[in-house]
């Protein structure tokens, strides 16, 4: 209820937005299409969707600003998996950037070119240090050479930190890779 109250104070007609979104979803599920409209197109067509997305982004930005203020000298970082899809989650990097110290591009990929592209895409959207998070998921990284190639690609694209993720999946051999490649 607090969210609905804040939305009303913000000027968003929550019931209207809900009805529009339900109608759009009902239509999409009744007649699926190969190329659905983007959120940006839906926002252009439906003021209620535009207002809902703007409200969500404002809510996230307000939260991140409060978090940064409370953090004091502690580093504030956010993770970015797909920078092009961030707006759908309510995170507009341009809006929250002033409240962040760093951004981590999540590179859960198996190809060095994909890691480079992810880092480049994030770096183009922010004027902050961009770190790389590389997965050790065995379905993505099958050898030390694969891991080294991903780390090298990340280091080629950013001067930020490179971290290994999915420690719960790490084998003894992968611990050795981390030591040799990142150590």
Kindly give the residue locations of the regions a language model identified.
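Polysaccharide-binding and catalytic clefts of secreted carbohydrate-active enzymes
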Residues: 1-96
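Active-site clefts of carbohydrate-active enzymes
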Residues: 32-49, 123-147
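Aromatic/hydrophobic pocket-lining residues that form the small-molecule binding cavity
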Residues: 60, 64, 115, 119, ...
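Surface-exposed amphipathic alpha-helices with a cationic face
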Residues: 64-76, 120-130, 155, 179-182
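Glycan-recognition and catalytic regions of carbohydrate-active enzymes
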Residues: 79, 129, 172
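Acidic (Asp/Glu)-rich catalytic clusters
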Residues: 93-99, 119-128, 151-158
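Substrate-binding cleft of secreted/luminal carbohydrate-active enzymes
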Residues: 100-116, 133-183
